[in-house]
Structure formats: structure tokens, C-alpha cells
Amino acid sequence: MSKVYFTRNINSESLIKIYKALGIELPGKVGIKVSTGEDGARGYLKQQLIAPLVKELNGTIIECNTAYGGSRAVTSKHIETVRKHGFYNYAEVDIMDSEGEFKIPVKNGKHLKYDLVGKNIANYDSMLNLAHGKGHAMGGFGGNIKNQSIGIASSKGKAYIHSVGQTEDVIKCWSAKYQQEEFIESMAEAAKAVSDYFEEHKKPIAYITVMNFLSVDCDCDANQSDPVMNDLGIVASLDPVANDQAFMDLVFSSREEGAKKLQERVDTRCGRHILEYGEQIGLGSTKYELIDIDK
């Protein structure tokens, strides 16, 4: 059974504390995968919260360009958005597909034959997958699995996942026909490909999800709606499925009235299917022990 650490406190000290609770040393050049947030979005993780941990790990913020236009579709505009959102104030930022991409295999994929990732991912010795937990218009919710699949894919790779393996074209991908469950499964397959790639190269990954600004919309939405429920805290694990499962369990066990809106967003998009499918393909376990570090 996987261990998931939990704190209700969301501040820079508790973020460092929960990372240390994992008992893992991220060696060498550390990539810290966050969502840099679309211009206009408000939920992305802010400097005040994450800068001390990023500095402690001497980490580089890593991200890839998007596949839907907007303020992060090309590197030059993406860099402007990153600067506007304050990431350059405390870290180096690497738009990993700015100089190209490469394919990594999806083993026994039902939908994807490969995952197309930002070329510079190869430069990192370890990774902290630092997700902002929230809803998502297409995936139902975004946590560590989405951050590792869509997030590490190049813009063409994102198109390939969004089209369930039909095209790498960033225009054509949006008119591809598929069942919703197939898209959810494609995200899990891409995340597993990244896990496999890191494991084969003996590069560890740690997973943290900050459950604040709980909007039904993702940080990739320039018109991100207001939070629908109160902040829940932070979860951390070495297992991305367990960590996302814990996030969903906290959302679905909430008795807050507004939580129903996020629950509805998740379930109308078959969002929790990514957990059972992720477990099925060996990405992680839905069974976990929750360790409350506040006690």
C-alpha cells in the first residue's frame, strides 16, 4: 500500500515539511514540473508558496508549450507569461520543447504508441511533479497524473494525447472523434511512459499536489472561474495514482455545498477513471495509507 502524506496547512514551511516527510533525496539537476498558468488564470502556484522549496532543491522550473493557442503556445509568448507570473524571480525556467522533442515508448498502450515529450527532459536527473489540484474542463480534474502527461508532452505531444493517438497536429486534434474514457486513458498512458522513462534511467520522481484555489477550471483557462470550495491542504507521495486518489477522496468526502460543483465537473468528464486505469496499467495504486503530518 502506498503512503500519502497530508497537511491542512498551505504555506512555504508546510510544503518543505511534506516534501521532507517523503524521505527521498532528489539528486543532481532537479526539474520541478509546475503549470505556469495561462495569462489571465489565477490558480497557478505562487512564488510566496513554492519559491523556498524550489531554492532548497536548487531546482529548475520545467514546462512545455501548449497546443491550443493562447499565451503559452509558442516559446516567446510563453516566456512573457512565465515572467508575468513571477517564476523568473526565483528560478531558472526551461520550456523543454523550445528546441524540439523526442518520442518515448508507451508500453502496451491501448490508445497511444508513444509519448512525445520536450527534448530537454533528458537533461534532468530527477523530478518533483508539483501539481496544483483543481478541476479541468476536459479531464474533470488536474493533479499529478495530468501534470506528468499533458504537462511534459511537447505541443505536438499534447495534440497526440488530446486526439487519443490520432494526430500530432495542434489544429486537427481538437476535431478528433473519440469516447471520453479513451482520452482519460490516453493521459494515464502518457504519464506511465514518463514514469517508465525516469525509472529506466534510474531518475526518481516525487509527487506533491497543492489543493488550493479549487476552481472547476484549470490553470490553462484564461477565464478561470472562482474557487467553489475552501482549500484542502497538500498531499505528497511517491505514487502519482495514490496522490491523485487522495486528492479526489478529500474532494468527494467534503460536505461543503460548493464541493458538489467540483464533484460534478470530475464525474461528468469521467475524471476518476484515470485512477482505476492508471492502477490497471501499473502507474500506481488506488490503495493508500494517509499519514497526517499535522498530528
Predicted regions and their residues:
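Extended, low-polarity segments enriched in aliphatic/aromatic residues
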Residues: M1-E56, T60-K295
